[in-house]
Amino acid sequence: IMGFTKPIEHFILQRKKVITMNTLYVGIDVSSKSNVVYLMLPNGDKHSNFSVANSHEGSTQLVKRILSALTSHSLDTVLIGLEATSVYGDNLVYFLREDATLAPFNRKIHVLNPKQVKKFHDAYNDLPKNDYVDSFVIADCLRFGRINKEVYLGDYRYKALQNLTRARFFAVQNLIKEKQRFMNVLFKKYSTMTQEKVFSDTFSTTALAVYDEFDSAEALANMDLHELTDFIIEKGKNRFPDPDAVAKAIQKAARSSYRLPKTVNDSVNQVLSISITSMKALESQIKEFDKAIKAQMELLPNVLISIPGIGPVYSAGIMAEIGDINRFDNQAALAKYAGLAWKQHQSGSFEAEVTRLIPSGNRFLKYYLYEAAFSLVRCDKEYSDFYHLKYKEVNRCQHKRALALTARKFVRLVFRLLKDNRLYVPAK
């Protein structure tokens, strides 16, 4: 193979051969411009390796080479594997699934976790690292069959839903980061207001109006109290039970805040104004994603929406990442796929009491499971009791631990409802 310092046969002879008859293994190392391919015969021997462009024309050449190998060796099954490398492999997978010339053969496509492929690669101590070697390792992973593999979602409705739920995930993360940056800048203008809970919602319409429409902490502190109260009533649409008390709390915080030089204060005001505009735009994006997700969910059966507190958005985020529930043998396999499994730390007679979550897993699925579980805590007594029980068991990382364990419990419910295709019935 190009890039090997030793013949590939050297490495093949160093490992135990696992023979699966009548199967061609295709390892593909995907990049933005090219796809490096390794074709492996059932006994582990090399058939060929080559590179094609990551384009429609290049994929057509790839299929022709696969067909030639299948027919020349009288094989009836082809297993194709590639790593999950951002968006670069999606179009190739669509092409391979839709290509009619491969239809007569038993065709399966697997998108592999790059971390697991790397660990498989590390088992070969003297293998170099390049694209041609990577394609060989991927093909060998498929042949051994002892690596957790993700079969590509065959139902395009799930892929369409996944595009929306993942885009929403990134919009939410951007909003969180923008709010964090906003609070850092707000401290410069109203230092005490960020330290004390003046508003129940730091990012409410009234709060943002106070941050944005007053030039400085000094101007706010010197404003007539009645005028400030009227301002609070107007911006809060007369929903504050005691607007006069709110106005007094705001002025008290403004008086004890630092005073900035005018030049610095002006730049801070500009940053806050732009940040508020960005947050409103992101919130608008999230609402549009929610509408699109709800419309897409009408095309899919959804038993998860029967769970209290789990609306169409959270259920969509979960279902989009799971796809066909039959991909998972049991609820433990689903939990591990979501990264909700704990590492065992044991040696001799020692058994660690504190263990960590595994670092791998589908971060999108984990996010939506966490969000759904926390919503369920607020709406379902059984899950609320479980969360608070786990919360009280420890003195540190209470919420984080309790939420992870609640999400793990929720996985069992999700698996059973999807597996049996039945609605949720609360415990009596």
Give the ranges of each region predicted by the language model.
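A detector of single, family-specific signature residues
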Residues: 1-428
